[in-house]
């Protein structure tokens, strides 16, 4: 889907954008920096903020292999790779760049991020503590989302700039915040909530391929997932109408 050429659908009352990289949660930031590490054989570039919950974009020799904490990740034909830092990560991240000539280890400190406490009251009790009769539905929804998020394609849209999905908005929920729903603490929020009038068009945050379209999930309502390549995906939730189909670019 071209982020400027079409719309995913329309708002209900708000939309929650969930940005994730495999099992590591990420937050897309617009104020980015480059760190370039040179040696005799090649240079390694990093774009991003090495803080808890951040998204890191890297570039190296396309023939190199890249490992993050000993886990091999994809490297594109032009040398791009990407990974996320967990919300609560406490250890430094070890990046291994390996080619035929040498193996280079890079250790980067991961800085702590302060998270907000968000209280939301007045929610329907069944949305805070679901009744037993919907457990199977929730389990099915979670599997559909998990399968879509697990896709690790060779697309390289992730290296382009992310944009917000709507032009005029109010942010009502931020990544990493601890939510207390109807007085009950819940797991941290792994997305961004936008409030806008009902019917507001929603666009993809960057080019990608639609991997999930569901009109009525229990927790997330109208839900769409885009694959941007290398395990990077964006999720669009709580939409009233959906105007894309699975497999659409």
Label each PLM-derived region with a short phrase.
Residues 5-9:
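Residue-identity detector for glycine
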Residues 30-39, 95:
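Sec-dependent N-terminal signal peptides
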Residues 44-113:
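Cationic-aromatic interfacial patches
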Residues 107-220:
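Surface-exposed, glycine-biased beta-strand/turn segments
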Residues 205-243:
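Zn2+-dependent peptidoglycan hydrolase active-site motif and core
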Residues 244-249:
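Beta-rich strand-turn-strand
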């Amino acid at each position: 889907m071209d982020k400027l050429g079409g719309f995913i659908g329309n708002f209900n009352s708000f939309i929650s954008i969930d940005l994730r990289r495999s099992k590591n949660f990420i937050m897309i930031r617009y104020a980015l920096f480059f760190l370039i590490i040179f040696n005799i054989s090649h240079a390694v570039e990093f774009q991003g903020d090495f803080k808890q919950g951040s998204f890191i974009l890297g570039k190296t020799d396309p023939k190199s292999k890249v490992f993050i904490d000993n886990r091999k990740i994809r490297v594109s034909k032009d040398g791009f790779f990407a990974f996320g830092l967990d919300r609560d990560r406490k250890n430094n991240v070890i990046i291994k760049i390996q080619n035929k000539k040498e193996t280079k280890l890079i250790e980067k400190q991961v800085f702590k991020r302060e998270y907000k406490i968000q209280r939301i009251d007045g929610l329907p009790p069944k949305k805070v503590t679901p009744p037993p009769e919907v457990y199977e539905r929730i389990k099915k929804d979670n599997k559909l989302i998990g399968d879509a998020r697990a896709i690790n394609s060779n697309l390289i849209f992730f290296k382009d700039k992310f944009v917000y999905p709507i032009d005029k908005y109010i942010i009502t929920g931020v990544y990493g915040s601890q939510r207390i729903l109807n007085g009950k603490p819940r797991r941290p929020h792994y997305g961004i909530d936008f409030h806008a009038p009902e019917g507001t068009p929603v666009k993809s945050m960057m080019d990608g391929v639609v991997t999930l379209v569901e009109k009525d999930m229990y927790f997330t309502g109208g839900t769409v997932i885009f694959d941007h390549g290398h395990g990077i995906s964006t999720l669009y939730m709580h939409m009233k109408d959906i105007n894309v189909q699975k497999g659409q670019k």
